Amino acid sequence: MARYDALELQVIDENGYEYIRAHEGVSIDDELLRFLRRTHTYELGWVKVEGDKYVRYDRIASVAIKRGLDDESGPGPSR
């Protein structure tokens, strides 16, 4: 069972969380820096999360690093 780290986003007016996996060859800490600085793939007003969903930056209430997520079950329900 593959485990991975991701950024966990809490979106305003939504139950649960959205997740962003670190890009290939990038640590989750560096991915968080890219997200906070809005560089690389985070330069636009929309952020791609797992699946084919996009979230607007101005709708994100918080971001945190979530470690050890399970590849088979995914992030799971709201925590």
Model segments located where?
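Intrinsically disordered, low-complexity segments enriched in small/polar residues
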Residues: 2, 15-17, 40, 52-55
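N-terminal acidic leader/helix
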Residues: 2-32
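Short small/polar-residue motifs
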Residues: 6, 33-36, 58-62
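Generic low-complexity, intrinsically disordered sequence content enriched
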Residues: 11, 32, 36-40, 69, ...
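Acidic, low-complexity, intrinsically disordered interaction modules
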Residues: 22, 26-45, 49
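Short, mixed-charge low-complexity intrinsically disordered segments
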Residues: 42-79
